Amino acid sequence: MSSATAAATATIAAAAAKLAATPAPAPSRRRLTLRGNPTARRCVAAMAVSTPRSAAAAAFLERRESERALHFVKYQGLGNDFIMVDNRDSAVPKVTPEEAAKLCDRNFGVGADGVIFVMPGVNGADYTMRIFNSDGSEPEMCGNGVRCFARFIAELENLQGTHSFKIHTGAGLIIPEIQNDGKVKVDMGQPILSGPDIPTKLPSTKNEAVVQADLAVDGSTWQVTCVSMGNPHCVTFGTKELKVLHVDDLKLSDIGPKFEHHEMFPARTNTEFVEVLSRSHLKMRVWERGAGATLACGTGACAVVVAAVLEGRAERKCVVDLPGGPLEIEWREDDNHIYMTGPAEAVFYGSAVH
């Protein structure tokens, strides 16, 4: 062996010894938390994923996540489901209407009827509530959404027991109260009955209100009563030919859009189809403006009771059955306010790339 070869061999041996003496980096262990599924929690808890990464790669991934990941809580109120976003640090929504529509897609996104943002309060309100529908449009208010909003606030603020909040919405000030049984009672304010303020082009039939007006849709003459709960509603109990509806027989995907986009409703409309079970018990299905057929609509249930009272079909305090479950609605004479009581609950927690 030449002296040069011997020197090279010695250098390689020394480098190998130094490498062997260097402790191996501990594998990173990433924990994924899943709530609501005990089996999944056990499986995930048993996993330890080794992901040796360079410092540069780790920094890139963390930066990317902080810029693109939207953290949310999925809530539902009688099956009307929403992606709830903590937006208290800004008056600008964290996602655009177009991004919200993608998030709401039930095949390519998270899946929801809308995205709701908890934002800083204005004009003396504790919080501001904004909503993007599943089509990206922005409604003034959502009754089921405001119940979810109240429960989400309680979770964010770690509040226990009964609490009420003043919430600024596109429909004005709304005051929900979390009750001891976990349900949320909401002062929905006063109904708007003047046609131009709803808005509708239908002529008034009772004082300034549009009550049992004729509306031609799909070859039939429907009798409708129009109400705004800060957002427009068209309520019908049947046609001139068919006085009593059996709402389960309706194909909403056919008839709903024809009401929503009818020329008599310049801002489009939500439509409620109602079956009277008794003077204190109503059953409805709804086609929501910007969301289509949904399992529940809180403002719609309020509008239904108002319409039923105006048409002499029901009392001021009713249980309203929706596909997702019942709501308790009361239209009080003393203050002309409508009160809605119903459930809202968290479904799961997650993050989505947007």
From Swiss-Prot:
Subcellular location: Plastid, Chloroplast
Ranges that cross the membrane: none
EC numbers for this chain: 5.1.1.7
GO molecular function terms attached to this record: diaminopimelate epimerase activity
Catalysed reactions, as listed in the record: (2S,6S)-2,6-diaminopimelate = meso-2,6-diaminopimelate
Active-site residue numbers: C142, C297
Pathway info: Amino-acid biosynthesis; L-lysine biosynthesis via DAP pathway; DL-2,6-diaminopimelate from LL-2,6-diaminopimelate: step 1/1
InterPro entries for the chain: DAP_epimerase_AS (IPR018510), DAP_epimerase_DapF (IPR001653)
NCBIfam families: DapF
Stated name of the protein: Diaminopimelate epimerase, chloroplastic
Protein's organism: Oryza sativa subsp. japonica
Gene from which this protein is expressed: DAPF
